[in-house]
Amino acid sequence: MDNMMITLPLLILFLPLVSFIILIFFGKKLPRQGDWVAVGSIVATFFFALYLFIQMILEYDPGVSHGASFSWIDLDAFKIDLGILVDNVTVVMLLIVTLVSSCTHIFSLKYMEGDIRYSRYFAYLGLFTFSMNGIVLADNLISMYMSWELVGVSSYLLIGHWFEKDSAADASKKAFLTNRVGDIGFFIGIMLLYSAVGSFAFGPIFDSIATGNTITGMTLTLAGLGIFLGAAAKSSQFPLHIWLPDAMEGPTPVSALMHAATMVAAGVYMSVRLFPIFTPDALLVIAYIGGITAILASLIAITQNDIKKVLAYSTVSQLGYMILAVGTGVYTAAFFHLLTHAMFKANLFYCSGSVIH
């Protein structure tokens, strides 16, 4: 059973990457430009995630976790491991990501039919799903950061899918650059934690914070705020919320997958996963940012007359509620709302796509 709890997450992680590689190199030579490769691999990951979820329900243990890692860089004074962590939070999030991604792939079969870059579109969806699963499964900050950057790259490619339109090209660049601002803070936060603890892995960092031996006070607050800056950019929080409404220039299924259910939820997921690093001062800032975003975005939404922009600002507002919950210490409520919001907002985007199409 332990082997299954490692093997299936690895398949969930790498099957979309295999799909991406096949479609990039051979997509146009395959029947139907290889859309069946993309859909088949993603639907398979959903059933794997569903199996893990059922096992979690049947053998419920709040403290259970499984992991595997290997040494990537091993120098005398510097070591980086890459690995995965599978616990209850991971399994639930994997189920949501693979379910929404599967629905998006199936919806796209007709929505994107006849598109001039049909196979490339499905390839990029696979790359994004691989990247998002990498964030969910990461057991250390470096693994998470690498997947975090890949999510940024794949969002740039998908938002700018119709790059012949100036508005789509500009929106993809705006999203990419705005997220890089947050990623700088994320990287600084990671380095502050590593310089104090000497490890990128979640376990040693959390243990060090709990004992108060190596990192406390201002350093921990700054590290937490730096990491939250990355979450704020990815989850479109004030003042880095400006990219999400413009990102609606991408195909509507992309909006459902990335800008309603998964990519924008990555910042909330990271905040929940790394909650122990946030000091009371950092949590106060997080709560204020979330509250401002929730109110501001909802007020902007009522002034919009474009169906996708209304949904975009609604998404920003709902993400603000999640971040506010994290800031007030109720991270379980934030995670619950992340799951419910992913489902209903993705469906709203599918409905808007049907109206537009």
Q: Which stretches of residues belong to each language-model region?
A:
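Transmembrane helix-loop-helix hairpins at membrane boundaries of multipass inner-membrane proteins
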Residues: 1-10, 25-123, 196-217, 242, ...
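Hydrophobic alpha-helical transmembrane segments of multi-pass integral membrane proteins
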Residues: 2-8, 16, 34, 141-143, ...
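Residue-level signal for short hydrophobic patches within transmembrane helices
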Residues: 7, 11-14, 18, 22, ...
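N-terminal signal-anchor/start-transfer transmembrane helix
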Residues: 13-27, 102-103, 232, 294
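Cytoplasmic juxtamembrane interface segments
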Residues: 18-38, 156-170
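Hydrophobic transmembrane alpha-helices and their helix-loop junctions in integral membrane proteins
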Residues: 103-144, 153-357
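Short phosphate-coordinating micro-motif centered on Lys-Gly-acidic
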Residues: 149
